[in-house]
C-alpha cells in the first residue's frame, strides 16, 4: 500500500532502499538512531507504512521508552482501525523483510540515508506546492490577491527552511557545566570571549565575540567603510584560528577577489598604493612584500560572484565543510544576494526576508557565525543627525528580527570636521550596536583610515597586544 502520487522520481529504487534501511535502524534501535529522529519527520517518508512505523517509534523514543522488533509492530497495529486488516497484513510482511536483515546501517550510512530521504521529501513537497499554486491561480479573486501572495510566500519559506533544519538535543548538565565555566572566568576577572574576537576590545566586551549560530548584520550608507570593516573582521578571525583545520569564507558580490586582497594587504602593511603609481610602489615595496608574506597563507577562501543565490552560498559552505571547519562566513553584501534563480514574482522586501531568514538558518546549520553587510535607506540622510535606527535597513524585510546583532557604522555630519577628515584620510566613527540579542547594546568609538582600509580602536591597545 504505497502512497499514490501523480509523479515518479527518476530513481525510485534508491529512495525506497533508503527508507527501508532507515526502518531497519529504527526497528532494531541501532546506533545513530538519534540522527534519524532529530532530522526526519513522518511526512518525510514516501510510503504510508513507513510513516506509521516512524511516527510510532518516534513517539516512544521521545517518551524515553524505545520499542523494537515485534513490539514496535504490535504498537503500530494497535493504533490502526480494527477493520483495517489490509494495512495490518502489509505491515507484517514489511516487518518480516526488515527483521530478516541482521546487519542494520552504521552511523556513516545512516547520515547518507537521512540525506537521501530528506532531499526526496523536499522535492516531493515542492512539486505538491507548485501543483497547488497552479490549481489555485484560476480561483483568485482580486480582493484576496495580497493575502494569497503572503500565504504562498509563507508556505514556500517553510519548505525551504525544512531542508536546512538541524536539531540536536543537549543534556542539561552539559549546558550547566559550560555556563559554570564562564561564570568562574568572570569571577577570576578574565575577559570572556566565547566566540571569535572582532579584534576590538570594547566591541568584544559587548558581544563576547562572534559566536556559532549567530547572524550579525553590519549596516551603513555607501562609502562608510562596510567592506573595509568586514575585511578587518576577516583578518582578525583568520589570525586566531588553526590554519591546518579551520577556514574563513568571504563572499564578495561587489568587489573582485584581487581588490579584497589589495585592501587586506594595505590594512596589514598600513600603507596605501595603486598599481598605476610606480613611484609609490617603490617607496613602500618592502612593507608590502613583508605584509604579503604574513597574510598570504592565512586560512581564507574568497568567492567573488556578482550574482549569488542562497542555494549557491549554501553549496559552497557545504563543499568547504567537507575538508575544513568553517569558523566564520562573511557576505558583502546582503541585498546583492538573490533568494532564488527566479524570484517568481516576490517583492524585493519578501525576497530580503527569505534571504535573512535563510542566512540565520545557515548559521545554525553549519554552527558558525555569519556576518553580512547591509545597505541603509536614504531616509537616514533626511534626519538632522543622520543617526541610523533599525527601520533604516534598506528593503529590510525581517532583517532586524532575524539578526542576532545589528551594528551601524556612523559618522558625524559636521561639514567642517568632515572636510578635515577627508584631507587626512582619518575619520572618527561610531560602531553602534543597536541590537544584541544575547547582551547589552552600546557604542564603540573607532578611527577609520580610508587610505589603508583600517579601523583602529581609539581607547584600547592593538589586537596583538590584547590577544597575544
Swiss-Prot record:
Its EC number is 5.6.2.3. ATP binds at residues 220-227. GO terms for biological process: DNA replication; DNA replication, synthesis of primer. It catalyses: Couples ATP hydrolysis with the unwinding of duplex DNA at the replication fork by translocating in the 5'-3' direction. This creates two antiparallel DNA single strands (ssDNA). The leading ssDNA polymer is the template for DNA polymerase III holoenzyme which synthesizes a continuous strand; ATP + H2O = ADP + phosphate + H(+). Disruption phenotype: Probably essential, it was not disrupted in a global transposon mutagenesis study. Keywords: ATP-binding, DNA replication, DNA-binding, Helicase, Hydrolase, Isomerase, Nucleotide-binding, Primosome. It is an enzyme of class 5 (isomerase). GO terms for cellular component: cytosol; primosome complex. The keyword ATP-binding applies. GO terms for molecular function: ATP binding; ATP hydrolysis activity; DNA binding; DNA helicase activity. Residues 189-462 form the SF4 helicase domain. The keyword tRNA-binding does not apply. Coiled coil: none annotated. InterPro entries: AAA+_ATPase (IPR003593), DNA_helicase_DnaB-like_C (IPR007694), DNA_helicase_N/primase_C (IPR016136), P-loop_NTPase (IPR027417). Homohexamer. The main replicative DNA helicase, it participates in initiation and elongation during chromosome replication. Travels ahead of the DNA replisome, separating dsDNA into templates for DNA synthesis. A processive ATP-dependent 5'-3' DNA helicase it has DNA-dependent ATPase activity. This is Replicative DNA helicase DnaB. The gene is dnaB.
